[in-house]
Amino acid sequence: MIIHPNFDPVAIHLGPLAVRWYGLMYLVGFIAAIVVGRIRLKLPYVAAQGWTAKDIDDMMFYGVLGTVLGGRLGYVLFYKADFYFSHPLDVFKVWEGGMSFHGGFLGVTLAMMLFAWQRKRHWLQVTDFVAPMVPLGLAAGRLGNFINGELWGRVTDPTAPWAMLFPGAMRDDAAWLPKHPELVEKWHLADVFMQYQMLPRHPSQLYEIALEGIALFFVLFLFARKPRPMGAISALFLIGYGLARFTVEFAREPDDFLGLLALGLSMGQWLSLPMILAGIAMMVWAYRRRAANAAA
């Protein structure tokens, strides 16, 4: 078993100010997006569409707003609506954590639609350009989660080479034991807990870095190297992210205030299903539209 390093959440101390790793990872993510965007400018078909470095800079401004506002509101509405409706001022306590990818995705989509309207472009042309820029930012965010020792995975067999002990999960581990006597006996978890006061878990943040971040980036980046029907790159992002997130959720610990929902699926899985279906529908539409235009 591997013990999580339990990093200091503060990366840099500047007198009374503290720069946290999670915030720093957001910065890394946005910088990575800019770098990928500038690399894409070198593709002939992208250059022919009139994209410029200034467009990327302006786009990032909209992207930051969409990510922060959408991510926060998505967390409030999708995950803890009852709490925040009772404590409305707590919505603004972003330093206490609480961001939702699916909310951030909707926020960025709306922000890109506004950007497209201002630049007189079709919004799918904008999202097709942006989609390959996103996954490395997602990977950076999940790395921030791992450094913080949060959003850990479900309890697993201690003999698994990837099993990890998370100090931040101690209270959850103690509460988990009496609820799962069969697994406690099967995996000899009582002995593990007696020795470490923790239980072995999946490092699901690392799985998300691998699938939602690195793998999805290469799939999108390679797919987008050639001209595709408008909407196809965006559709592949929806399908790829949705499938990656749906899969990893089987190893990720559900939010304790929600647990598992209908059919034993988590909130993250239920929110990913519409993404997958929308992506498939958009992909079919994109290629049929191109075929119809070619035949006209």
Curated annotation (Swiss-Prot):
Its EC number is 2.5.1.145. The keyword Glycoprotein does not apply. It comes from Burkholderia cenocepacia (strain HI2424). One of its GO terms (molecular function) is phosphatidylglycerol-prolipoprotein diacylglyceryl transferase activity. Keywords: Cell inner membrane, Cell membrane, Membrane, Transferase, Transmembrane, Transmembrane helix. It comes from the Bacteria. The chain crosses the membrane at residues 17-37, 59-79, 97-117, 129-149, 204-224, 230-250, 257-277. Signal peptide: none annotated. Its main location: membrane. GO terms for cellular component: plasma membrane. Belongs to the Lgt family. Catalyzes the transfer of the diacylglyceryl group from phosphatidylglycerol to the sulfhydryl group of the N-terminal cysteine of a prolipoprotein, the first step in the formation of mature lipoproteins. The keyword DNA damage does not apply. InterPro entries: Lgt (IPR001640). GO terms for biological process: lipoprotein biosynthetic process. It is a multi-pass membrane protein. This is Phosphatidylglycerol--prolipoprotein diacylglyceryl transferase. Pathway: Protein modification; lipoprotein biosynthesis (diacylglyceryl transfer).
